[in-house]
């Protein structure tokens, strides 16, 4: 028996679904069928109970459906899907990795918020994705040390600047020292580094040597440096 709920646009969305019937519809050659099903699944996942979504059979069914549908889904539908499932711990790993490599407008919410993305996924993305994707990774909250080290090795100025502005990243002292060193040639890094909570007084003293007057004043005020 199907139990309907109302979708975000007033459409009926089922919360008990026959996997065989849905997979048949997902394999339909009619674009309208595939589009309708993906929209219903997006609405469903946005409203279903977490325990229901975490059930093994449901996780397998959702993963198969999304991977079948997303390959031919239009851009705006993929974007809606990414926004809906970005923070979801139940999201299929394969789907999240596919969306993370999509156009940046689609990938950004997934890169920023998905708890499904692991360090090795993010490091792989740094190698395989565009500069915009790499910047989004550097801005991700609570970025781990292995990912930070991968960013530092690439030495991409725009990505380093994004990392310098990430106050929640787990930046070690040695990584912070490397960022300060990079700021000598990358001027855009200087202002966020001067405000960074992990900047120490000895690092500030080095940073002071190549920043402008306004940042020098800020550093002196913050660390009581001897100009």
Indicate residue ranges for each PLM-predicted region.
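Alpha-helical scaffold segments
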Residues: 2-227
């Amino acid at each position: 028996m199907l139990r309907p709920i109302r979708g975000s646009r007033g459409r009926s969305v089922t919360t008990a679904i026959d996997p065989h019937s849905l997979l048949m519809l997902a394999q339909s050659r009619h674009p309208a069928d595939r589009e309708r099903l993906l929209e219903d699944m997006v609405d469903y996942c946005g409203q279903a109970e977490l325990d229901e979504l975490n059930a093994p059979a449901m996780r397998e069914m959702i993963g198969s459906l999304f991977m079948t549908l997303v390959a031919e889904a239009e851009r705006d539908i993929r974007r809606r899907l990414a926004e809906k499932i970005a923070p979801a711990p139940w999201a299929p790993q394969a789907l999240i990795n596919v969306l993370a490599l999509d156009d940046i407008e689609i990938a950004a919410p997934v890169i920023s918020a998905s708890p499904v993305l692991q360090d090795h996924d993010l490091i792989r993305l740094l190698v395989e994705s565009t500069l915009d994707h790499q910047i989004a990774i550097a801005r991700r909250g609570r970025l781990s040390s292995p990912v930070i080290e991968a960013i530092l090795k690439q030495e991409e100025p725009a990505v380093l600047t994004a990392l310098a502005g990430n106050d929640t990243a787990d930046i070690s002292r040695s990584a912070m020292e490397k960022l300060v060193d990079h700021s000598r040639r990358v001027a855009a890094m200087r202002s966020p580094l001067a405000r960074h909570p992990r900047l120490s007084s000895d690092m500030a003293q080095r940073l002071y040597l190549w920043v402008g007057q306004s940042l020098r004043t800020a550093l002196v005020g913050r660390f009581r440096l001897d100009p």
